[in-house]
């Protein structure tokens, strides 16, 4: 009997196959699962239904082991008897009975907790999203009106707390000590409620031994997960006589920038880094933050969250309503949750996980939209700083130091002077050594022939982090801007990351192992550090987690993940699965056009015959054969090449000829977005064609469903610029690595070719994957370049696209077949 996995609808066959693969991977102890499920196939719902079904089944299995083994369960965190009075000398039936009674009591306690959640839910407590940002909310903490005080009397706010450079710890002032004493006293007074909190928290931890961490790239994708999570109903893991209604304990995590409800911070600061430091500064101040409550307030917040499935906006509104900081309250609730959603950055940064107390041990980690995971890891662990940014930062530091040096303690003065000196070294190095983009440099080379031996990068970074000096300096510079020009203040207040934060990120890179990444010059006299071995950064996740599931709509070529993220994984500890699309086979045809000869190589792509004859005639014929109510979306390899084609067609009247058949819209690098106008024309059932750019604004994240795209065209192969600084460094790294491991020059040539092919085909898959969005959708894919016939290129296409490649390669035959296909669809619909 096939499992339904608690799917809210009748699942398609491919959805069942995907869910069976996920459930099987979790049951058999696989470490890695790489899954491709095309957009429009219900991937998110399949992921959560299969993983949560396994989670509940596993919990039931662990409880059964507890009962069968007299309270000893493998991989279970449920603590039964450790009472010395019940030793091994007692008869088994006595121990088993005693442990069983403890387990029963825990389950009854969980049932009481679920009833407690029922009580909260039945009070018709409503999260009002309109409360967000509404200062008229009567439930909010009342705040004093802040009168304007001349800047001269406010300068204390720009000073960091005294810093002890040897121990790298802040001095604890008397007021702080007093504050701690008060906190300790309050903790004693709240001991009863604290005990109750500990009971419910520990109970949830014990009965949820395995967690699911679901990470995705964007806020909208995480929001979609929450909406999908509301659809299925999962049975309780426990006997109904104990727990009849076991809710999903779902928790979305967000940043301070998303969740801060203190207007004194959010109205002043816009960058994530500045908001983080402003928050920490306020918490350390004598008055503290009125929303930063502990113990019972956070427990109440958690219980409200666990009454149902709430997205990040719900969490923010809940914090506003309860006068509780949503950021810290969600952090405190992590250990009690079953399912946690979080942005990529929280998952992929080990230091961030540590600071949030995110423990991945024995957990299931699901990374959605994982096609860009490698690039994201590289980006998170890379850094970049320009000569101009270094100079601007140095000027700011010097101004700040000149103003406050007499009021800074020795630790702050010494470290600020060291920072200024370090910036001076970097500025001098760039001025003396910059020659061209892509020029490799080493961290040691930067400090040669300097007195940098007195500079400890680790300690300077710690100083920036602990003293919050970046936030302090930025506050001061903003105040100067406000005093000098109120109009300029709005601009400075809303600027992006303060430069000292960017400098700190770059300084961290200087301490990275040489074999993991490279430093090199980029244009505009910039230095960039680029991570080249993402497997090292991903290793901690792989080591801790029970299973890591990477899922996406376009995961090919899958070999890229094994090569870059887990090269040492044992093959039998991994599983890969590429499911077909939900559409019938005849709803999508893929054509590779070889006649006429399309070849958009760098040397040939500007050939007048190719552009003005073959390419133009192709679009004329396609425009005629695709029904006028159906749109055409054509992708070009770059903005410059698309503009070249448009300019050529305009100069000889071809543009107007095509425009008379279909209204032309095209994407330009600095122009307005043509998508909305294109959609209006299609919705009015008029013929239109949209020319877009691979890697541009329209190639990812846009749904071209139904009539918006009855034909998608890929013009050429979108290879990256092989002369860019980043790609030169990556190419050199691949070559060095292969030769170091005993490979030949032929191996090097093959590997570098495959490297560029992979980048190209990932972009192709992302672009053509926009066309089909649901089971009744249909479209044709046209690949305009004879190189698509090469088996190494063809094999890197997504499986559902590759399997539908048609035998016809001649343009005339392809157009005849296309016409028949569209006529058939028109009749059937």
From Swiss-Prot:
Query: Which domain of life, per UniProt?
Result: Eukaryota
Q: Where in the cell is it found?
A: Nucleus
Q: List residues binding ATP.
A: 37-44
Report the principal subcellular site. Answer: nucleus
Q: Which pairs of positions does the record mark as disulfide bonds?
A: none
The entry assigns this protein to a family as follows: Belongs to the DEAD box helicase family. DEAH subfamily. DDX11/CHL1 sub-subfamily.
Query: PANTHER family under this entry?
Result: ATP-DEPENDENT DNA HELICASE DDX11-RELATED (PTHR11472:SF41), DNA REPAIR DEAD HELICASE RAD3/XP-D SUBFAMILY MEMBER (PTHR11472)
**Official protein name in the record:** ATP-dependent DNA helicase CHL1
Please tell me the species this chain comes from: Vanderwaltozyma polyspora (strain ATCC 22028 / DSM 70294 / BCRC 21397 / CBS 2163 / NBRC 10782 / NRRL Y-8283 / UCD 57-17) (Kluyveromyces polysporus)
């Amino acid at each position: 009997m096939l499992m339904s996995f608690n799917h809210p609808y009748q699942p398609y066959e491919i959805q069942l196959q995907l869910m069976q693969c996920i459930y099987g991977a979790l049951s058999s102890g696989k470490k890695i699962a790489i899954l491709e499920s095309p957009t429009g196939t219900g991937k998110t719902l399949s992921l959560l239904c299969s993983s949560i079904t396994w989670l509940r089944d596993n919990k039931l299995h662990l409880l059964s082991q507890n009962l069968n083994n007299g309270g000893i369960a493998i991989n279970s965190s449920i603590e039964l008897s450790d009472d010395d009075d019940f030793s091994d000398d007692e008869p088994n039936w006595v121990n088993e009975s005693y442990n069983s009674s403890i387990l029963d009591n825990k389950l009854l306690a969980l049932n009481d907790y679920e009833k407690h959640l029922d009580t909260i839910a039945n009070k018709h407590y409503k999260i009002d999203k309109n409360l967000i940002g509404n200062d008229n909310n009567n439930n909010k903490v009342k705040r004093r009106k802040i009168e304007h005080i001349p800047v001269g009397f406010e300068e204390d706010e720009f000073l960091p707390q005294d810093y002890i450079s040897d121990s790298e710890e802040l001095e604890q002032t008397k007021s702080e000590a007093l504050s701690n004493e008060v906190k300790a006293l309050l903790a004693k007074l709240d001991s009863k409620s604290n005990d109750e909190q500990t009971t419910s928290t520990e109970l949830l931890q014990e009965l949820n031994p395995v967690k699911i961490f679901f990470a995705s790239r964007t806020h909208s994708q995480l929001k979609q997960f929450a909406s999908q999570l509301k659809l299925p109903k999962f049975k309780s893991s426990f006997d109904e006589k104990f727990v009849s209604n076991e809710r999903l304990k779902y928790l979305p995590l967000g940043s301070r920038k998303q969740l801060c409800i203190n207007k004194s911070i959010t109205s002043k600061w816009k960058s994530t880094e500045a908001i983080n430091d402003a928050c920490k500064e306020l918490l350390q101040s004598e008055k503290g933050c009125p929303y930063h409550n502990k113990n019972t307030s956070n427990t109440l917040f958690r219980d409200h969250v666990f009454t149902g499935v709430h997205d990040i906006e719900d969490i923010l509104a809940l914090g506003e309503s309860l006068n509780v900081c949503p950021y810290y309250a969600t952090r405190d609730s992590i250990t009690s949750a079953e399912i946690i959603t979080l942005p990529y950055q929280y998952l992929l940064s080990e230091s961030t996980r540590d600071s949030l107390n995110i423990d991945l041990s024995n957990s299931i980690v699901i990374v959605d939209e994982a096609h860009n995971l490698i690039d994201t890891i590289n980006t998170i662990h890379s850094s970049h700083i320009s000569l101009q940014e270094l100079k601007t930062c140095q000027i700011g530091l010097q101004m700040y130091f000149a103003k406050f040096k007499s009021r800074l303690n020795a630790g702050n003065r010494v470290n600020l002077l060291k920072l200024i000196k370090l910036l001076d070294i970097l500025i001098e190095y760039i001025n003396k050594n910059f020659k061209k983009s892509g020029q490799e440099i080493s961290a040691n080379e930067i400090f040669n022939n300097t007195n940098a031996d007195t500079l400890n990068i680790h300690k300077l970074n710690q100083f920036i982090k602990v003293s919050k000096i970046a936030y302090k300096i930025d506050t001061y510079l903003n105040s100067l801007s406000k005093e000098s020009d109120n109009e300029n203040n709005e601009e400075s207040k809303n600027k992006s990351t303060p430069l000292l934060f960017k400098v700190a990120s770059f300084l961290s890179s200087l301490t990275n192992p040489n074999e993991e990444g490279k430093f090199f010059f980029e244009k505009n006299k910039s230095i960039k550090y680029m991570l080249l071995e993402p497997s090292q950064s991903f290793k901690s996740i792989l080591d801790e987690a029970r299973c890591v599931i990477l899922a996406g709509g376009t995961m090919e070529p899958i070999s890229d993940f094994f090569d870059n993220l887990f090269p040492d994984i044992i093959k039998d500890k991994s599983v890969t699965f590429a499911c077909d699309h939900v559409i019938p086979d005849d709803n999508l045809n893929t054509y590779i056009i070889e006649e006429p000869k399309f070849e958009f190589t760098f040397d040939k792509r500007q050939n007048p015959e190719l552009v003005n004859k073959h390419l133009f005639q192709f679009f004329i014929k396609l425009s005629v054969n695709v029904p006028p109510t159906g749109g055409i979306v054509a992708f070009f390899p770059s903005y410059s090449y698309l503009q070249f084609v448009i300019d050529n067609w305009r100069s000889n009247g071809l543009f107007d000829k095509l425009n008379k058949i279909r209204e032309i819209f095209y994407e330009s690098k600095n122009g307005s977005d043509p998508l909305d106008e294109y959609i209006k024309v299609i919705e009015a059932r008029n013929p239109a064609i949209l020319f877009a750019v691979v890697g541009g604004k329209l190639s990812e994240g846009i749904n071209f469903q139904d009539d918006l795209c009855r034909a998608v065209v890929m013009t050429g192969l979108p290879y990256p610029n092989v002369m860019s600084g980043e790609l030169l460094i990556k190419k050199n790294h691949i070559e060095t690595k292969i030769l170091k491991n005993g490979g030949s020059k032929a191996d090097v040539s093959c590997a570098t070719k495959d490297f560029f092919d992979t980048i190209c085909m990932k972009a192709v898959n992302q672009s053509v994957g926009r066309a089909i969005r649901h089971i009744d959708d249909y479209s044709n894919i046209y690949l305009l370049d004879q190189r698509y016939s090469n088996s190494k290129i063809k094999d890197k296409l997504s499986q559902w696209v590759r399997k539908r490649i048609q035998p016809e390669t001649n343009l005339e035959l392809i157009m005849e077949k296309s016409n028949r296909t569209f006529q058939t669809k028109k009749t059937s619909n």
